Design a protein with these regions (language model features):
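Interdomain boundary/hinge elements
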Residues: 2, 178-181, 185, 238, ...
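Structured core elements
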Residues: 28, 106-108, 118-121, 125-130, ...
Length: 365
């Protein structure tokens, strides 16, 4: 981590110099008050720049992401922020969190903080170690087993939220794709773009993947266009084709919102409720957020319920069978264990069996 911290510091400096070259001046990159005028007064990246309540130009990540296609400086600024966050939040901070007595990093899990029922983690947050970028993966590699006789083993649910929505909506095409063990993103692309499964291109699969996960969070054509290379009209067309391909998905989502309006809550597969006080709000923005929660909460909440069942049954079986292995972490859809090398095969089989059997859906877990 110390070596990586030095490398990230150098990378941040190089990015800053490139940004200053493109801007034609130096300024404090961490100051929105200085960054805003450079982007919107000098470079004129937007016709009607968004402003904060205090009247400053907004340079929030969601605002800059929508402008990334307008000028290369935006991508460099977002990258600089990413490098700085990685360095400050993880690379520099994690060594400070090592417990002097155990020589380990310990976290605190919160059972009743996230409204969806997910566990959350803090002091430090070990559920948020980045893994989607090569740099983030390097941070994860800093977590190792206690000695060379032990290994870390991780097991996660594959696309559990999509499996849950397929099961809850009972959409025959989506259910069939999972039951046939198809790549759900490729299967979605084949249906949406009207091509054979084996003819799906990498770009088509990528776009289908974005829609698959975005639908759960109520993605709009505007939001989808910001996450892909598609225009807003192309994004709308893709979303429309998606719902045509999975019609029962759309009717399920509408039914969830209607139920929430009438009852004031939605529930997970285990019946755990989330109350939505703003579902009938006269404020369209507030009501829209509650409607998205009406769709998302049963899906995310059910995933949380299912992995908690798995954790309990795995722990019980490990105790009964006198495993020396320990369950270390839950990272939303993933469980991390430290186990003696001699127990690895047996633990792998136990964890796989119990995670798959935790709850019965219309599709396999």
């Amino acid at each position: 981590l110390n070596r990586m911290g030095t490398e990230l510091g150098q990378e941040a400096q190089q990015l800053a110099e490139r940004i200053f070259d493109q801007a034609g001046e130096t300024f404090n990159l961490a100051s929105p008050k200085q960054l805003g005028p450079v982007l919107f007064d000098k470079l004129k990246l937007a016709d009607k720049p968004k402003k904060t309540k205090t009247g400053q130009y907004s340079t929030a990540e969601d605002v800059l992401s929508t402008l990334a296609k307008n000028h290369p400086i935006v991508a460099d600024i977002l990258e600089w922020r990413s490098v700085q966050k990685l360095n400050n939040t993880y690379v520099s901070a994690l060594p400070e969190d090592v417990n002097a007595h155990s020589n380990r990093v310990h976290t605190v899990y919160n059972q009743a903080v996230a409204a969806t029922g997910r566990l959350s983690s803090n002091h430090p947050n070990l559920q948020n170690i980045p893994i989607r970028t090569p740099r983030g993966q390097q941070v994860r590699k800093a977590f190792i087993a206690k000695d060379d006789q032990h290994v870390l083993m991780a097991a996660d649910y594959s696309q559990i939220e999509l499996r849950i929505i397929a099961s809850l909506s009972e959409d025959p095409s989506m259910v069939a794709a999972f039951n046939n063990n198809e790549d759900i993103h490729a299967a979605t692309a084949a249906k949406v773009f009207g091509v054979l499964l084996e003819e799906v291109s990498r770009e088509q699969r990528s776009q289908a993947k974005t829609v698959n996960f975005g639908i759960i969070y109520g993605v709009s054509a505007f939001g989808l266009s910001n996450q892909t290379t598609l225009s807003r009209s192309e994004s709308k067309e893709l979303i429309d084709m998606y719902y045509e391909s999975y019609p029962k998905l759309k009717s399920y989502m509408s039914a969830q919102v209607d139920f929430a309006r009438e009852q004031g809550y939605v529930a997970t597969v285990l019946g755990r409720r989330r109350y939505l006080k703003d579902i009938n709000s006269r404020n369209a923005i507030v009501r829209g957020a509650a409607e998205r929660n009406a769709i998302n909460a049963p899906i995310q909440g059910s995933a949380a319920d299912i992995i908690k069942i798995a954790m309990l049954t795995i722990y019980d079986k490990m105790q009964q069978q006198h495993f020396k292995a320990q369950m270390l972490l839950q990272v939303h859809d993933e469980l991390v264990f430290e186990c003696p090398k001699s127990e690895l095969d047996a633990l792998t089989q136990l964890v796989k069996t119990e995670m798959e059997a935790a709850y019965s859906l219309q599709v396999p877990l």
